[in-house]
């Protein structure tokens, strides 16, 4: 069993199509290479894509887990996850989107507590809506990775979220500018982007990590960071992702140490 101090990391955005799910899956691959036991929670309850990307056929999902908790049938989170490989499991989004309406935010902290008892790293792929569930997720993770693109609406909406964080003295987050998603979209300079967000950009994923034939990997259920060809031709980009992965773990440890000292 993993340490009871498993790290909970959310990958979030305020707009769809910014590479959030891709980032979550790539991080899972990197943590697997670090010999970590990894759980990906697909918290995009209405249109989650983790199971599709990884080509897994899940029989259980997060709604079934919550239903068991609420009816005192819950035994272990392992009963509700689907394995991708020997070190990566997935807690899938509801198979029936109607079930998403029944998921209450109050269960999120319980799921996180159960998950960190079994896994070293728990990656939470959220949707882009700032609803009660997502706000609960952001409140209870160890660290958040906020994904933005060179898009004015995306940046202005992210600024609003960051302002909420600042007003509540929340500092456990990193901002990532993803330039690999839409390589022709470079309307705003880095200076402009910082001015709009009113904060620094912690990491930038360059357009060199644009994968033209990414659908091929999705159809094969492959994780980019575990693919030899991707590592060979995009070694610098993968190394940058690894730095992000390590920093997220360090940040989680810092938060845990602060909590223990209080």
Language model features with spans:
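Well-ordered beta-strand positions
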Residues: 121, 143, 199-203
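G-domain G4 guanine-recognition motif of GTPases
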Residues: 14, 149-150, 173-185, 204-211
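Walker A (P-loop) phosphate-binding motif
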Residues: 2-39
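Phosphate-binding loop that captures ATP/GTP phosphates
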Residues: 31-90
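Inter-motif core of Ras-like GTPase G domains
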Residues: 114, 129-151
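Acidic-aromatic/histidine active-site loop/patch
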Residues: 1-8, 163-168, 172-173, 218, ...
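Beta-strand-loop-alpha "switch" segments that mediate conformational coupling across diverse proteins
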Residues: 181, 193-225
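Cytosolic-facing regulatory segments adjacent to core modules
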Residues: 69-133
